[in-house]
Amino acid sequence: FFNKKTNKRIKSDDLIGTDDLLKNLRKSDDYQVDEDSYIRARLFDMLIGDWDRHEDQWRWATFKNNGKIIYKPVPRDRDQAFSKNDGLILGFLTRAIPALKLMQVYDEDMRNVKWFNLEPYPLDMALINESVKIDWDKQVQLITTNISEKIIDEAFTFFPKEVSDESVEEIKRKLIGRLQNLQTISDQYFLEINKYGVVKGTNKDDFFEIKRHQNKT
């Protein structure tokens, strides 16, 4: 990991799986997830169209900070990026069968943000607790500022010559379009995961204070 504030690389103390992460989060509030990093990783999933983001697709790097254990996400196996599901029958099935609606053909925009995130939604609800709209907006800005058309062009030069055909230009065009639509996609998913308030605690004697506002939140 690279710390931009200190301009130095930092090493993780350990790497754990999602099951162990969730167990530790239930133990105590001394265990915390770096929500900004997780939101950024999830927005990148949506940028490249990778809908296959189940719990085993993540590892968690462990860092100690002021007596707390902070977990930073380490995404892996991004094997459904830029998906293209051809065929009339498959196209119909991915619209008609709820369990298959996450399998969306990659395009400039997202057909349905809710169904695209069907698989990672439970984990998102479990891990994104403190972040508000401005936090999501900052991560969108960070991604869109650092991924330019020039960087995209350079990245695709690493494609093997055997697969560098006309489809590469199509993917690049759609990726640039998706990048321009990322704020709208982020806004839609932020509303989706905030439809319901989920109160999360630990195995300790936690105290919750719940206030009702005039807008019924």
Predicted regions and their residues:
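ATP-dependent phospho-/nucleotidyl transfer catalytic cores
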Residues: 1-50, 63-72, 84-87, 96-97, ...
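Residue immediately N-terminal to the catalytic "proton-acceptor" Asp
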Residues: 51-56
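Conserved protein-kinase catalytic-loop segment immediately C-terminal to the catalytic Asp
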Residues: 57-61
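C-terminal catalytic region of ATP-dependent kinase domains
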Residues: 62-207, 215
